[in-house]
Structure formats: C-alpha cells, structure tokens
Amino acid sequence: MADDPQGLAYGLLLQSECRFWNHNLPFMFENVGKEAGRVDELLMPADLLAEGSVLRNAVEVMTPEDCGVDDPSGNVEIIGWLYQYYISERKNEVMDGFKKNHKAGANEIPAATQLFTPDWIVRYLVQNTVGRLWMQSHPDSQLYKNWDYYIQPSGDDSAGNEDIFNIQVPEDLTVCDPACGSGHMLTYAFDLLYEIYEEEGYAPSDIPGLILKHNLYGMEIDERAASLAAFALTMKARSRSRRFFKKQVEPNIQHISPIAFKEDEVAELNDLYQVNLDSMVWNTYAKADVYGSLIQPPQELVELAASSPESEDGIDTLFDLSLIHI
C-alpha cells in the first residue's frame, strides 16, 4: 500500500477498529492490540479501495435489501451465505480429491462438510421442535399463529408428552446445534425464543441476554464458522437491545478442537477428579477436529461433567431432558 496513501489510511483505520471491537467481540476480534503484536501482522489486501477490489465488490453486491436494513433484526444469515462462497473453492478441491479416492484429513473436513441450510428448512425444524415443545407446555399460547411451517400435533402425537417435557419458563428451553456452522439455525431459534419471552412478559432489554445465557448452544469444528456464529448471535442480540454490549454476555458457541492426553496426564486427571477412567475415555476427543459432533461421549464423561464444580455455570444443562438437538 506504499503507493496508495488513501488505502494505507483505510488499512490503519481497519486495524484500529479491530482493536476497538475486541472488548465487545473477543471471539471475532482477538487480542490484536500493539502489545500482542497481532494486528500489525494483519495482511491488508493491495488496492483496498480500487475498482474490482474485495471491499468495493462487497459494497456493490451487498445491497441494503440483502442486508435487511428495513428489518428490525436485520439479515444475519447473509454472513453464512458469504462464508459458504468464501470456502467454495476449497470445498471443490476436497470433493475432487474424493473422486480420486483421496481421504479427507482434519484440515479438509470443515470445507467438505459445510452446507448452508435453506431458510424454510431452518424455520420448519425450529418451529416443530422448540416451538412445539413450548406449545405442549403452554397450550393457550397464540404464538403458533406466527409460525408458517408449524404443524399442529394430532391427538395421538401429543398424548403423554406433557409429563416428559414440562417447560415452565423460557429459561428451561435449551437448544443445541451440534454442527452449527455460521449459526443459521441458532439465529432463527433466537427470534422464536424472543417471541416466547415477550409473550411471557419479560422486559425487552433483558431478553437478548437471557437467550444467549440460558437457551442457545452451538458446536462447530470449523473455527472461522464458529466465530461467525457467535458474531451473528451477538448482532441478533444487539439489534434487539442497543445497550446489549454493556451486559457483557457472550454466546455459548464452542469450537470443537482435539484434546489428547499422555499416560502420565491421564493419571494426573484421575487423581484430580478422584476417578479411575482409562486412557481411551479421557482421549474421547483426540480426533474431535475430524469427527466433531459424531462423537458420542462415554457416560462416565457425561456424569463427570455434570458433577464437576465447573458445571455450576450451566455445563450440566447440556445433558438435561429439555435439551433439543437440531
């Protein structure tokens, strides 16, 4: 950018914005201050503002209608569409490798498995899981009239379900997307949950924070996609409450990364938690970046997670009866 003073100035401005937003969005803008030496290593594309540049194309292609400027909650799903396009070339490379009998490694799995779910499918799934569960416990609710894809259960379908799921308050609903991608399922679940909280009389300024704290969980093997999911949910919350950032509530989005232990570390873990689990159990997530949400945690780990002191902040809610896998 040495020959483009204006582009250099905008690059410095971009770096400054990254530093500023780190406080509110640490999962999106990592600690990139000068003391970390990170933001100065950020590669700025040449000709940032030139004809045909990435920024210029983005401004021209992303119209106000695409971004949902007239919608109070915006159109955060555009983030997922952009990311799908961003990784499409890499995905094609991996797929071509499959045709040549090449196996996908940990680095190829995220690109190969990214599939953006169409909006109508998202609405159908969420309305007939989260929405139906709420309606079963609150049959007088009129919210279902707003759900275009909701299917009223027949008498046979609803018989006996009242005792299985008895959701008294919105906080009792826990929604987990074990392969959340850029968060399309969770962002629509946010909208539906907001309607539920609103109908129950909660203060509008409190609802976004309550949803992110109590209701929504996501897991993803693609670190970039996980960051985008957290960003999309945060923007959803911010669109509903202008003072949301002051609450300092972060989305419950977990990047699934491999965790492996050596034999001596296994012994230390058993001593620490006063259990006697073998190495295979402790290394359940050694290839988490390959298998992701396909991994079924052994019952011993589930019980340990639910009983450990750390579970007081809500880890154990991932295993209770009101958990909904989408």
Where are these regions (language model features)?
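Non-catalytic, mostly N-terminal accessory regions of nucleic-acid modification and defense proteins
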Residues: 1-137, 234-258
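SAM-dependent methyltransferase catalytic region
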Residues: 100-324
